[in-house]
């Protein structure tokens, strides 16, 4: 399947080696970025053999079967909806949407068009989660679960200095619960 990527940030840089590698089920056809990120995006295309770069989302959608959406959280719904309406399968970074109602709306749109819609949360496939699923039936009734997920953010010093990145801003579908809290409940 021909895959298009929307975004050129950290998560895209982490996944591109696998997505363009020999084990990938996809052919990465194009990468779409903002004008501001065009230079970095083109460098990623050159480094990983992605044949096309564009700053037009409509153009990206015209070239691919599947789109991987890796942009700030607040933009997930907008670009997911546009891809589904264009008849494209979607893999969208977490959170898919800032509310359950919006996520269900996207899921219904995908169902109505017989398209796949995936949220790119992978923790549930890790070995420690498999072990929990194996042991849980032996434990009996679970009455409480307490989880702690801690991760240093490269943006922490900016946060302390008063600069609030979208990943920390609840108004942008960010903040502890939307950005990292999903790992505790997945």
Language model: regions and residue ranges:
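Hydrophobic residues in well-ordered beta-strands that form the structural core
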Residues: 12, 69, 92-93, 117-119
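Core-facing hydrophobic residues within beta-strands of well-ordered domains
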Residues: 26-28, 64, 142
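Rossmann-fold dehydrogenase core element
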Residues: 105-122, 143-144
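Predominantly a Rossmann-like dinucleotide-binding segment in NAD(P)-dependent oxidoreductases
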Residues: 123-186
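N-terminal Rossmann-like dinucleotide-binding module
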Residues: 1-48
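Beta-loop-alpha module in the N-terminal Rossmann-like domain of NAD(P)-dependent dehydrogenases
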Residues: 50-109
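Receiver (REC) domain switch-region micro-motif
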Residues: 31, 67, 145
């Amino acid at each position: 399947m021909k895959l298009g990527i929307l975004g050129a940030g950290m998560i895209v840089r982490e996944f591109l080696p696998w997505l363009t590698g020999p084990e990938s089920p996809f052919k990465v056809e194009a990468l779409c970025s903002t004008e501001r990120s065009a230079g970095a995006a083109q460098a990623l295309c050159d480094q990983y053999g992605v044949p096309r770069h564009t700053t037009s989302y409509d153009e990206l959608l015209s070239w691919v079967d599947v789109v991987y959406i890796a942009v700030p959280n607040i933009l997930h719904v907008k670009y997911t909806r546009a891809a589904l309406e264009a008849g494209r399968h979607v893999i969208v970074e977490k959170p898919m949407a800032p509310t359950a109602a919006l996520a269900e709306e996207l899921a219904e749109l995908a169902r109505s068009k017989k398209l796949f819609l995936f949220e790119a949360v992978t923790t549930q496939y890790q070995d420690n989660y498999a072990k929990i699923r194996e042991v849980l039936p032996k434990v009996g009734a679970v009455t409480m679960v307490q989880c702690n997920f801690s991760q240093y953010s490269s943006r922490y010093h900016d946060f302390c200095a008063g600069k609030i990145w979208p990943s920390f801003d609840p108004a942008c579908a960010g903040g502890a619960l939307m950005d990292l809290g999903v790992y505790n409940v997945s």
